[in-house]
Amino acid sequence: MNSADCRIFRISADASLREQRVLRKELFCSLRPGALPVIVDLSSLMGLNHDDIDLLLDCAALASGRDVRLLLVAGSRPNRVLLEITRLSSVLPVFNLLADALDSIARAKTFPAENAFASDPARPRSA
């Protein structure tokens, strides 16, 4: 898998307010209908604050109404727990590692019929 197959956004705790605004704008623009899959990588964060959660909720809402795949990389147990508490893990696929998210995209590209319901919240997730 190469970077041309998806867009990866790494959320950083030390980003300035200006950098956060630019990231938010680029992320929202990437969630246009029919766009490449988007991965939001939270693995560099020790925890999620309210701004991070707001961003993810907004992204989930945008992605749900469009034909675009949005995946999250929790990176840590505390992040995964917060994603479960906010119910984001019930509407978006959540992975522990970036490599796992990239593999999921590669599998969906190789076997599209098998992964047609990969974002269905009713399906159990093994990631």
Where are the language model's segments positioned?
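Short linear motifs in intrinsically disordered/low-complexity regions
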Residues: 3-6, 42, 121
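Amphipathic alpha-helical interaction surfaces in cytosolic regulatory modules
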Residues: 17-92
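A charged, well-structured terminal subsegment
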Residues: 96-123
